[in-house]
Amino acid sequence: MVLPIIIGLGVTMVALSVKSGLNAWTVYKTLSPLTIAKLNNIRIENPTAGYRDALKFKSSLIDEELKNRLNQYQGGFAPRMTEPEALLILDISAREINHLDEKLLKKKHRKAMVRNHPDRGGSPYMAAKINEAKEVLERSVLLRKR
């Protein structure tokens, strides 16, 4: 009489363990290396320092001033938006990341859309990127849910 209850509890515990493990795995797959470092309290000084030379503009046919400006330009958007890129687009500073909640995200998104809305002369592409940045951060583990 007690054996079916014990078996039922065992099966339930195994099922809950598998479910929580799968949920943790799906969250882990969406994390960027920079976010993983932050969650583990690992300080990264300059994550792109190793790639700076690869991005240098090396043409000898242009003047030095223009070459310096091109070397400082980091490029356009990544093919798939990352959390750091979304934070830059929505102008969320390092201090604000610790307090990032739905209210702050909505405020920053609204401010960016007011500045870049297509009805006010902004680019539709930029407006789409702002919306994409908001969606990325809504799915992010950086966002504090209430």
From Swiss-Prot:
InterPro entries linked: DnaJ_domain, J_dom_sf
Chief location: mitochondrion
Cellular component GO terms, alphabetical: mitochondrial inner membrane; PAM complex, Tim23 associated import motor
Lineage: Eukaryota, Fungi, Dikarya, Ascomycota, Saccharomycotina
Native organism: Saccharomyces cerevisiae (strain ATCC 204508 / S288c) (Baker's yeast)
Key words of the record: Chaperone, Membrane, Mitochondrion, Mitochondrion inner membrane, Protein transport, Stress response, Translocation, Transport
Name by which UniProt lists this protein: Mitochondrial DnaJ homolog 2
Function of the protein: Plays a role in mitochondrial biogenesis and protein folding. Participates in the translocation of transit peptide-containing proteins from the inner membrane into the mitochondrial matrix in an ATP-dependent manner, probably by stimulating activity of mtHSP70 (SSC1).
One BP term from GO: protein import into mitochondrial matrix
Further remark: Present with 573 molecules/cell in log phase SD medium.
Positions of transmembrane segments: none
Domain J per the UniProt entry, residue ranges: 85-146
UniProt GO molecular function: ATPase activator activity
Protein's cellular compartments: Mitochondrion inner membrane
